[in-house]
Amino acid sequence: VRHSPWKVASLLFCSGFCALIYQTVWLRQFRLIFGASTFATGAVLAIFMAGLGIGSALLGKRADAKERPLAYYALLEFFIAVAAALSPLLLWVAARIYFASGGSPDLGIAVATLLRLFLALLVLGPATFLMGGTLPAAARAVETNDDSGRRGVALLYGVNTLGAVAGALLSTFVMLETFGNRRTLFIAVLVNLIVAVIARSMARVSPASSRPEDFEDTGTGWKPAVLDRPVYIASSLVGFAFLLMELVWYRMLSPVLGGTTYMFGLILAIALLGIGLGGAAYSLFRRGPATPGGFAITCSLEALAIAFPFALGDRLAILANVLRDLGAVGGFGGHVLSWTIVTVIVVFPAAFIAGIQFPLLIALLGRGRENVGRQIGAAYAWNTGGAIAGSLAGGFGLIPLLSAPSTWRLVAVLLALLAFAAVLVAARARQHAFATATIIIGIAAIAATFAPGPTAVWRHSGIGAARAPKPKTRNELLEFLHNTRRIIAWERDGRESSVAIAALDDTAFVVNGKSDGAARHDAPTQVMAGLLGGIFHPQPKTALVVGLGTGSTVGWMAAIPSMERVDAIELEPVVLDVARMCEPVSADAMKNPVVKVTIADAREVLLTTDKKYDIISSEPSNPYRAGIASLFTREFYEASADRLNPGGYLVQWVQAYQIHAGTMQTIYGTVTSVFPHVLTWWTSPGDLVLVASREPIVMDVSQLRRRIAQEPFRSGLHNSWRVESAEQFVARVAANEDFARAAAKEAPAINTDDRTVIEFGFARSIDAAATVLGQIMLTAHNMKMNAPVGLRGDLDWKAVDANRVWSLRRAPADNPPNLAVMATKTLEMAKNGDVRAEVFAAILRQREPLESDVILATLRSRQNRQDEAAELLRGALVAYRTNPWPDPDVMFSGVELAMNVGRGSPQRARMLYDAMSQPFAVMLQENYRRQVLIELASMVDRCGPQTLAAIRAVEPHPYWTRDMLELRAECYARNGLEDLAERALEDLATFDANTPAPIITPQSPPTPRGSS
């Protein structure tokens, strides 16, 4: 008597639910031990999948020999639950062993990887080995010999995978945030035990027969269409392709969906949903035995399903940008819906076809119950082996070597070629069904890979981080597309991330679609994250910095005279190239022998090293990104405290944007649970830096004045903050230690390794306009909690308050309290022709000669003394090539002024053209500089060599304004560049076609009534 397939399938649903939760929790837990590097994650995934594959192969054979396979299944589920319940203890043992070993910094990558494999095997081996045997055992319990297509196997496979979908969604969106890792794991253990009990009960009531007569020939004369070995190889290849493609999906969807834990869970859930529904569809609709031709067409269809979203390219990115508005309507649920729509388009079709493939391969091996356990086990083992190879090949080789888009192309071509090979096998077996369709679809898939595919608009525009503009018209959209593609100066796919340099108005390095720092505009945070701890510590000798980035934090910290060693911990090797490009603002960090860069995970380093530091500065990426929140946990701060010398400081960056008050309270609560004394500084309108210590933070005013007058503090404070005095420095204190403790008392939770609540809090507010800087400063001011508790000595508090008032209002003051306000105020005077600007410009010249020149040039231009203005401006523009520290607003005004001063005089235009012909330091104002350069060139030689060179320098992404497009078309036509002229005219026609027609044409005004 066979068991009801649907009853057994319900058990498999719960089994899949538990297995996915186990996998999710174990990966998160191992990330806390080994770190989040590709090497570490790859080792854990390899053991997890290898355990499944080996267990499937070995236990599948045993399932065929069992008289009561459902009882065998129940036993497997029981011991899986036991092994999972023991895993927290085994993880603790693994952590102690790994931390004692010194990790990858001491052992090296090769030895550390071997140790990770061993420890992962210790923790995961028993459970995953047993998991591998569950599907063969369950299939043995439901299959009958009259099931020629093995639809029962497909049903179990599909429903098991749908259970995994439920596990992925519930764990990601509910359980991990609510219960934490450990309790989520034990909930799954409880469900697993219930499954074991129910399965055992079902086995007692209705045992399946395994007698020899069950395998007697039914008289149909059926023989396998192909030998076993080709089927196993095919199973391996599709496993390789799908896992490789899964890595590409994660890498490519992160820029448009945000890279949060929610995104990764959603991609996994959609992929599993497709597989599950594909398996169920095979079970419900497949009639008759499987054929090689059927497998061939699934491969070609999967290739097309993968290639089609690639061919859509930036259209999908634009769709994702448009769908962001769903978040404004439906809140977080609207965001999830928008992510789901994009993910379904990209992932679901290929996953659905992959779900059909596996049961089809099982059906190619045999029919009914005969050897079903062994064949499922072997096919699954080969499939898992291919998946392991695909995962390792993608993470360690193909994506960094070829880039993610090229790997996307490769997967589609590989599947198309596999389809063609399957057609040949089918032809030899004289099975010609689907051959023509397979070839046509496969060729279409390969053809689709020749499309441009995703460009910088998809990969680097910040759509997922809510940084991309939302165009309202067709021309605004085209302007966005051209601008985004034009400003990307450099890009690489690294081992861990995709990295690019966006040269809009600065050297901004973009990681997985979001800017993680700009050389000049983020210098107020990056430089001072390196210097704040050094200002308070009397003689810092050793420091550790989490995250290399532009190198500014590391470089300025290393410039402190007493500093002997600065260890910079960076996860992505490609970022070292970024740091080298930013040396003009980083005090030549990468050339300083004091700086030692380690490519590793920061948690791993802190937990395995025995070094002690005077300062630890942590400036990772945003906590909403998967895995980053573990650098903001109580355990991370405890490890930091253990690594600090007495009197040492932790300097922690916190974003002040896209954050709600509850999340900020949690951060305060977490930091103060380890460091009772926390001083909050505002470094820029969007950034906070917490200076934390186990001892009271003492700020002696006389010592402070001496300290900030010394180098590198004097230059660092001036360049980044425009701070010249102790009063201006203290004005940067947003809140004192009492405020931090008061906020901590209201924290809704503590961010821990087990429950990283800020990860989810930040992810829910990723598209929010919420900021906390103003709230913190106003509340601290009203509660008199904005003066450092440990302040000793006299300060001019009126000057402190004047600086704070300006910082909150962001408006020029009548009596400028600092150089930044003075520059803004004086520039405004110059633009209005106010001669008082000369007096302030003379004062500014002592510390800000470039700002002074630009302001005077502005005044002279306003006074119609254009030759004097041009000369002053020329000097400033040439100096900008090597000086990265000008005031950004004044600099922009100077570049804009060059265009106005150059008009009417080819000589002035040529002078300014020559001054702007080279990029400024760290590519400041690069996009605008190139645009103004075209304008100046046209004033010099209207479509001559200079104009032509300036226009061609931005091809094929012109500035999308009518004047620029018209000039471009004219110059190409006049120089006989027919192909370029034709394209330029097409672009101009497109611009005009998308420009609304005026109600009244300006060239033809109507005749007034009554005129003759």
PLM regions with names:
Residues 829, 860, 898-901, 937-940, ...:
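Residue at a conserved register position within TPR or TPR-like alpha-solenoid repeats
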Residues 821-824, 855, 893-896, 930-935, ...:
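"A position-specific structural signal for the A-helix of alpha-solenoid helical repeats
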Residues 850-855, 880-891, 920-931, 956-965, ...:
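Boundary/linker segments of alpha-helical solenoid repeat arrays
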Residues 1-706, 710-713, 762-768:
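Alpha-helical transmembrane segments of multi-pass membrane proteins
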Residues 701-805:
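SAM/dcSAM-binding transferase cores
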Residues 807-811, 834-845, 867-880, 905-920, ...:
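Alpha-helical repeat scaffolds
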Residues 967, 971-974, 978-1012:
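Terminal, low-structured helical/coil segments at or just beyond the last alpha-helical repeat
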